[in-house]
Amino acid sequence: MRCPFCQHDDSRVLDSRVCEDGTAIRRRRQCPMCERRFTTIERMQMTVHKRNGIEEPFSRDKVIRGVRNACKGRPVTDADLALLGQRVEDGLRARGVAEIPSEEIGLAILGPLRELDSIAYLRFASVYLNYNTIEDFATEIDRLRDESSDKTKSSSRKRLSKQDEPLF
């Protein structure tokens, strides 16, 4: 690593630590020429392949900006969006692939967004999945209702089974 002070081509690593929830490594370095110390942060760079052939670095902020538009007027906080962005990035990094098609990023957003807010999910999915007709919306709404009723039935069963348990 080149020294930022004297531009010498080499440096010595004094200390390495995992940081940023395990997604980066912080290294403390020292230049053998000027003996000044500096810190570097290293992380795996994910590259996004867009439909038009352009490649660009993955940006969690760009994911959050795209989802924020779908969440306008909904009870979704900045903290909720930050967590969604983290979940999407973690899911993509877990695949262990450095180059990601942009379509996969959209698909990775859909699951966490569905859990966060169903209306925001419908808004995002309508653009991302290219809904063209009212039937497309109706099909997706029916799917969301089915999932919601399945969750309600499951939680009701859990409550009923807990009521059957003895108190002592």
Curated annotation (Swiss-Prot):
Molecular function GO terms recorded: ATP binding; DNA binding; zinc ion binding
Stretches assigned to the ATP-cone domain: 46-136
NCBIfam families assigned: transcriptional regulator NrdR (TIGR00244)
One Pfam family from the record: ATP-cone
UniProt KW Lipid biosynthesis keyword: no
Protein name: Transcriptional repressor NrdR
Annotated function: Negatively regulates transcription of bacterial ribonucleotide reductase nrd genes and operons by binding to NrdR-boxes.
Entry similarity comment: Belongs to the NrdR family.
